[in-house]
Regions:
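Hydrophobic faces of well-ordered beta-strands that scaffold small-molecule active sites
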Residues: 35-39, 64-66, 88-92, 112-114, ...
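Conserved, mostly hydrophobic/aromatic
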Residues: 56, 104, 138, 169, ...
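Glycine-rich phosphate-binding active-site loops on the catalytic face of alpha/beta enzymes
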Residues: 59-65, 69-73, 114-123, 159, ...
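Active-site-adjacent beta->alpha loops and helix N-cap segments on the catalytic face
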Residues: 11-26, 44-51, 66-84, 97-102, ...
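C-terminal helical cap(s) of enzyme catalytic domains, especially alpha/beta-barrels
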Residues: 1-4, 183-216
Length: 216
């Protein structure tokens, strides 16, 4: 689904420069809204790491999720991003070893992105027990060691598409959720009716936000 959205965006003439222009418009309207973009390292590399990060910061981006850069090769990226005040969340999956999780957490800033399930992105009807076991394990490791100077927020993503899912994740102890495929699906469904699209997106976000705020 995300890949299909990527192709559609490219066909519509969207590129990194246009994305930065869109972010700039959002930032002017919402000055306090945290904005973390997701991209591939190839874009940063081809456009000049420092140059692109600086332009991104100036447009209003607060950080990047770069899923295809391994922690063994991320020192330059993390260093340059840190100089500009950009956060660098990294991803941890259910099969990430404890030693590697410590390394990932030590290089992450802003938050740690915990992948909820094995497989690819997309909407799921339910989550397995291992999802919640892994969340508890991640919290244990982060809180029981000096991995970071202060406990880093844990955000979980992949497959979350209902308020009930959001509540389950928050009940398990995470600090936030990431929802993507559900929104992409609604954009695709109503792409010829902008008013309807915006109304549906607002309804989804509002219901997720409400579920998160209802946590004790």
């Amino acid at each position: 689904m995300i890949q299909e959205a990527l192709y559609q965006s490219l066909n519509n003439g969207i590129n990194p420069d246009e994305c930065l222009r869109i972010v700039s418009k959002i930032r002017k309207k919402f000055s306090e809204l945290p904005i973390v973009a997701i991209t591939y390292y190839n874009i940063l590399y081809k456009r000049g790491l420092n140059s692109f990060l600086e332009r991104s910061m100036e447009s209003g981006i607060d950080g990047f999720i770069v899923p295809d850069i391994p922690i063994e090769h991320c020192n330059e990226y993390v260093s340059e991003a840190s100089k500009l005040g950009l956060v660098t969340p990294f991803l941890a999956s259910p099969n990430t070893s404890e030693s590697r999780l410590r390394s990932i957490a030590s290089m992450s800033s802003g938050f740690l992105y915990v992948i909820s399930a094995y497989g690819t992105t997309g909407m799921r009807k339910s989550f397995e027990k291992y999802t919640f076991d892994n969340i508890r394990n991640v919290k244990r490791i982060i809180n029981s060691t000096n991995v970071t100077t202060s406990p880093i927020p844990i955000i979980v993503g992949f497959g979350i598409n209902t308020p009930q899912h959001a509540k389950l994740m928050l009940d398990s102890g995470v600090d936030g959720i990431i929802v993507a495929s559900k929104l992409v699906d609604k954009i695709k469904e109503s792409r010829n009716n902008e008013a309807q699209m915006l109304q549906q997106i607002k309804a989804i976000v509002s219901s997720m936000k409400k579920a998160c705020k209802e946590q004790p």
